[in-house]
């Protein structure tokens, strides 16, 4: 099983150990590993470096993987619990008739901030370009989510159709880069909980976890809109244990297992039967289950053309390596200081030698 980090109930904090429960029920041994972005997951599967039986990509990546023949059609006779998925999440654009995937969880992007370090609560994505937060901003370390934030700020589509659109939005990210402390994924947990940064961007379910660990943290859905993602369970075309994989997916759709996962990770369940039995705090959480006003502004990712996707990969890498001369200037300053120190030491030795001659 290849899943996002921090994305399953694992037995800690008195939670259910879902993997162990599946192993006990079926006798099937699960090798469980994690990834931190759709792109890293895709790259690993595409390279053939590892073979997995269950993966959990997001909607736009599902569409890409289906188009490239990377996913196997599901045998729903092995997944009867898929009927627990609400009808609204069936037959999606990214996987018509759900031939290849079963929804696992939903999430929305937003801003998390430390109320003791931020004087005025942020209200929009554009606040992440405010110089008052210089050195205290955490940004997504993946191209699609970071691009979407800049696109929201610019008032353009989060799904670019031309390389020129990509170039324009990445320039906006480049302008922000001097203000960014770090580009992160799961590293955000330690940084925000530990008060190492004032403001960051991440996913709604993880925000609930961070706020539970540090009550000084707060969350906001920016007024420009947010990205709504559906993370799905799927079986790679290269799987050697497809029936066992489908048994695992079926197990994850059990209401009590769905409840355990939703309560542990804080994400939004696609199953009404799970929502009905959730703890009250999560059931009525405005982060996990936002208002209709927030939902009306949500956008979803779609798969990009190969040309646009390639342009985004290239421009994202260039942006990440761009330092506006800052690193070069720092290197030159350090080099000058080292030369000056060396010259000073040579002068002292010569002066001492001269004195000793007298």
PLM region spans:
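Short beta-strand->loop
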Residues: 72-83, 101, 215-227, 236-239
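A structural signal for short loop-to-beta-strand junctions that line the ligand-binding cleft
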Residues: 50-56, 72-111, 136-138
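Mature extracytoplasmic/periplasmic domains
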Residues: 236-296
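Ligand-binding "clamshell"
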Residues: 66-73, 93-99, 209-221, 283-286
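Early extracytoplasmic/lumenal segment of secretory-pathway proteins
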Residues: 1-64, 190
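Short loop->beta-strand "edge-of-pocket" segments that line small-molecule binding or catalytic clefts
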Residues: 127-141
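Ligand-binding pocket segment of bilobal, Venus flytrap-like solute-binding proteins
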Residues: 138-142, 146, 150, 158-222
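Conserved C-terminal helix/tail region of periplasmic/extracytoplasmic solute-binding proteins
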Residues: 292-358
